[in-house]
Amino acid sequence: MINFSLSLTKSMSYSFIWMLFVIHISCVLSADGNHILCSPSFTCGNQRGLLYPFWIAGRKECGHPDFELDCNAGVPELSISSVKFRILGADYDSGIITLARSDNIDDPCLPNSFTTSFNETVLPLASTTDLLTIYYDCNRNVSSFVSTFVKELDCPDDGTDDRRNYYLTRNLTFLPPSLKLEGNSFLLNDFGGSCSRNVSNPASRTALNTLESTPSTDNLKIALEDGFALEVNSDCRTCIDSKGACGFSQTSSRFVCYYRQEPQNPTRNKVILKLFFIVIYVLGIGAASFAMMGVILVVTCLNCLIRRQRKTLNDPRMRTSDDSRQQNLKALIPLKHYSYAQVTSITKSFAEVIGKGGFGTVYRGTLYDGRSVAVKVLKESQGNGEDFINEVASMSQTSHVNIVTLLGFCSEGYKRAIIYEFMENGSLDKFISSKKSSTMDWRELYGIALGVARGLEYLHHGCRTRIVHFDIKPQNVLLDDNLSPKVSDFGLAKLCERKESILSLMDTRGTIGYIAPEVFSRVYGRVSHKSDVYSYGMLVLDIIGARNKTSTEDTTSSTSSMYFPEWIYRDLEKAHNGKSIETAISNEEDEIAKKMTLVGLWCIQPWPLDRPAMNRVVEMMEGNLDALEVPPRPVLQQIPTATLQESSTFSEDISAYTEICSINVA
């Protein structure tokens, strides 16, 4: 019986050690295999020395999925949003890759070209790259102001004498002080609105400077032929510098760095093999006693670990940094702190769901004094809770009739919740997305829009620290019994000191349709509190759209109508011809509707410097209609569909990001 047990134990020991040996060898082969595959560069067409993020058949693990190359044309080409780009050069020592558009490299007058953009996380634009914008089929008559920025493009005659093509060589967001647009940017918007389309191409700043000093179609072709520079991803450069090979994991869908195993010495391998068999023999002889000793050792270690952990939990001097941060949070925020058990009791075990926000589910609850409250329970996957801390800190500093009141919070490890006042009427979207909007008159809608403006004005200008919301939309505007609006959900709010209002975002945040253009493209400038102004303008136009839903049904199916309500301008043109925005309303209501429309349109100007600040928006809403001018029709660059689809999920599931408040505002 003893011999049988010993033999069984010996057999199990052999199997276990052999399994460890096989697993180790397979892991080494896998790591070495990817490094061997991806470490050497490859040739595609006339280009040598290509590496990540580019790849060809047989090297899928070595490149990003968006950057597969086609080598059949003799030059390496890749397709992005149906636009082909060719590689002009790749210098991984300097970290610069040069590309050019294949469709207009020889002819900038192609009628079907359109704007596309790169995944700048993988290949960011180099600092030497700027944007060249070409406007097609525009009015011939150009003002003297506009002519200082745009030059005529000599394309084959299309048969019309009053239409021309033009190009713009500089990024208007970063003009020198001597060329400030001041109040004349609407002239450029009017010019862009007169064109049938415009296409933005990255280009070398040196070539654009030459084109600007010596305008000609030949120099324009040279600027397109020279292409534009992109930088190798910083993660990849770090990987290459550390003797690794850049690649992409199909399993985790993220960048990986493959490293090779150290070369083995043959003599050393023989010694290791002998030791391997000796260890097997020794373990086989003493397996029973070793097994018993192993069990005792494991039990002893586990017991020590458990006792040590209990001591750590009970000793305040041994608490983790997370516990310290949470204690500091509770001490700094002057709000009632609830335990998770109390939250469960308040919500009656989370019985009634009243909504789902970007970071969790909202439940109805009742405090011990009988007051109804809304309890927002965050998802347990929210990392270290930075967004939660941000929300509680920002909301605890606010006190305004148009800002939702925070009553308390819960923070126990990954269990986090906020408790705020309950609104019987729910959120604004339930009114403007249903037949309820037709029962609300223009005075009520105006009161809601004005209240939201006052709330945002308070966040931007009335707090000790400027609070930027970044997710203004109907779902985040709550209505009390008197239909007075209250701005809620500060889960996306970012705080800056009053004189440091320019924000830098690592992730796009917000809700598609309400996101300002500068969040998508640096062409429009930097992200700041003016992004909230844009979202507010879209909110106001959304309210007007709900009131005029029947007149817009023919446009709502269009994707572009999500981003700009063209029907608003058509109705304004009708108003100039004697027709009001909506029939069967009084003159007073007609004036209110027009005022809301004009304010909304001013707020959604594509250039942040053309949008009014929220304190000015309140003045416009409270002022006379006669003092408001019709703003120019915005001309937005085309936003690739893929970008929009990715961004539409950001407000629902987003990682923490870093805010840099680095530019002082006088």
Curated annotation (Swiss-Prot):
Q: Which Gene3D superfamilies match?
A: Phosphorylase Kinase, domain 1, Transferase(Phosphotransferase) domain 1
- Reading the lineage from the top rank, the first entry is Eukaryota
What is the reaction catalyzed? Answer: L-seryl-[protein] + ATP = O-phospho-L-seryl-[protein] + ADP + H(+); L-threonyl-[protein] + ATP = O-phospho-L-threonyl-[protein] + ADP + H(+)
**EC number per UniProt:** 2.7.11.1
Any idea where the Protein kinase domain is? 348-636
Phosphotyrosine occurs at 420
Modification sites for Phosphothreonine? 508, 511
Q: Name one GO molecular function term.
A: ATP binding
Leader peptide range in chain numbering: 1-30
Which residues hold ATP? 354-362, 376
Q: Which residues form the active site?
A: 471 (proton acceptor)
Q: Which residues lie on this side of the membrane: Cytoplasmic?
A: 297-666
Q: Name one GO cellular component term.
A: membrane
Report if keyword Thylakoid is assigned.
no
Which compartments is it annotated to reside in? Answer: Membrane
Entry keyword set = ATP-binding, Glycoprotein, Kinase, Membrane, Nucleotide-binding, Phosphoprotein, Receptor, Serine/threonine-protein kinase, Signal, Transferase, Transmembrane, Transmembrane helix
Instruction: Give each disulfide bond as a residue pair.
Output: none
Regions that span the bilayer: 276-296
Main location group: membrane
Q: Any ranges marked Extracellular in the topology annotation, and which?
A: 31-275
Q: Which residues are glycosylated?
A: 119, 141, 171, 198
What family is reported? Answer: Belongs to the protein kinase superfamily. Ser/Thr protein kinase family.
Q: What is this protein called?
A: LEAF RUST 10 DISEASE-RESISTANCE LOCUS RECEPTOR-LIKE PROTEIN KINASE-like 2.5
Organism of origin is: Arabidopsis thaliana (Mouse-ear cress)
Name of the gene encoding the protein in the UniProt record: LRK10L-2.5
